[in-house]
């Protein structure tokens, strides 16, 4: 007779609470992405102050409806300045949105209720108003660099009120 399979504890499933970013497996790392696609928006940096300004213009590879990359595996080949997040740079990049799970975990904070790892539903990031769905006004192919300033918006650097709630609204 074989011993029954050990049932994992609830805590074992919460790998982001027990592992550092460096200790995560590839699939764990990838699952930390909430799918908001805010990092796929074009950004401007003030050369004097270093302040980052988000725009509502996306990378040409972003599928703005799905909030995902059209060619994730080859994104760096197609868009050479696409930043691949890693444990080192998530601690230093000043343009990650306040909702970014990589940033939250690096700071020792927990994920929000709408994160798919918490909710079990990839649509809660949209429900909470965190994703770029319905807010992108074109891609980098549609807007010349010299006109990007006309597309600066505040919302990507902010966390919507309903997203800050402790639990999913009824």
Swiss-Prot record:
Protein name as it appears in the record: UPF0260 protein RPC_1790
NCBIfam families noted in UniProt: PRK05170.1-5 (NF003501), PRK05170.2-5 (NF003507)
Family of the protein in this entry: Belongs to the UPF0260 family.
PANTHER family in the cross-refs: UPF0260 PROTEIN YCGN (PTHR37421:SF1)
């Amino acid at each position: 007779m074989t011993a029954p399979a050990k049932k994992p504890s609830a805590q074992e499933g919460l790998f982001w609470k027990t592992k550092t970013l460096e200790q995560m497996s590839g699939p764990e790392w990838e699952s930390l992405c909430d799918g908001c696609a805010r990092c796929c928006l074009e950004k401007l940096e003030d050369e004097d102050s270093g302040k980052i300004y988000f725009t509502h213009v996306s990378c040409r590879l972003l599928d703005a409806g799905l909030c995902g990359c059209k060619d994730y595996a080859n994104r760096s080949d197609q868009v050479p300045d696409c930043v691949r997040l890693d444990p080192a740079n998530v601690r230093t990049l000043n343009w990650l949105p306040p909702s970014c799970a990589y940033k939250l975990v690096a700071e020792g904070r927990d994920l929000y209720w709408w994160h798919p790892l918490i909710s079990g539903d990839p649509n809660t990031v949209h429900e909470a108003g965190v994703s770029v769905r319905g807010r992108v006004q074109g891609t980098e192919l549609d807007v010349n660099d010299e006109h990007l300033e006309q597309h600066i918006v505040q919302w990507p650097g902010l966390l919507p009120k309903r997203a800050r709630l402790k639990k999913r609204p009824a």
